[in-house]
């Protein structure tokens, strides 16, 4: 079942109010999660085995699995976690969640990937210090406020967890660096 309510933010409608089939923002996240949740584990394993043979053919012995979280679905992270010992390539799991207790309980020592501090340049949501050239009234958006980011990074440091954050714009990068500087001083 992939259906997304037409009233959900991000469902593009045509002039007569009917969906065009283009899903953005929340509608895209809901649709993607519905699709990913519906995939059987056999399909996941088959896809991983195909990727593994290609990786090994090219001499690649480690690949980071950046899985789960609100942009995708936790099912892939859970699958990688459950089957990690079965792969011929080392696949450290970066669980894309800010729920450190959940990650810690699984015995994982890394978190992140698409934990988004800001957005993308193409959507004008990357947080810039100067306005966008084609939108002089807008500088993008910080998704994680500094105090929340500081606390999250400090928790990762206290628990000795490796952390990967998504930051594109220079304001977001500055915010991440500041959070790391503050965590180091704690």
Each model region followed by its residue ranges:
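Acidic/histidine-enriched ion/cofactor-binding microenvironments in catalytic or ligand-binding pockets
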Residues: 104-105
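Phosphate- and divalent-cation-binding pockets in alpha/beta enzyme and binding domains
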Residues: 175
């Amino acid at each position: 079942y992939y259906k997304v309510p037409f009233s959900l933010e991000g469902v593009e409608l045509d002039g007569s109010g009917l969906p065009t089939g283009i899903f953005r923002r929340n509608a895209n996240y809901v649709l993607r999660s519905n699709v990913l949740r519906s995939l059987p584990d056999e399909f996941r394993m088959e896809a991983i085995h195909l990727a593994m043979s290609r990786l090994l053919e090219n001499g690649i012995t480690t690949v980071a699995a950046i899985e789960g979280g609100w942009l995708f679905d936790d099912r892939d992270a859970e699958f990688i976690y459950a089957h990690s010992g079965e792969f011929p390539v080392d696949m450290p799991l970066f669980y894309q969640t800010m729920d450190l207790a959940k990650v810690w309980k699984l015995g994982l020592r890394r978190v992140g990937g698409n934990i988004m501090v800001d957005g993308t340049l193409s959507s004008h949501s990357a947080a810039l210090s100067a306005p966008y050239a084609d939108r002089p009234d807008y500088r993008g958006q910080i998704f994680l406020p500094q105090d929340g980011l500081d606390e999250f990074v400090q928790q990762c440091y206290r628990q000795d967890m490796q952390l990967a954050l998504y930051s594109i714009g220079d304001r977001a990068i500055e915010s991440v660096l500041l959070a790391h500087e503050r965590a180091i001083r704690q």
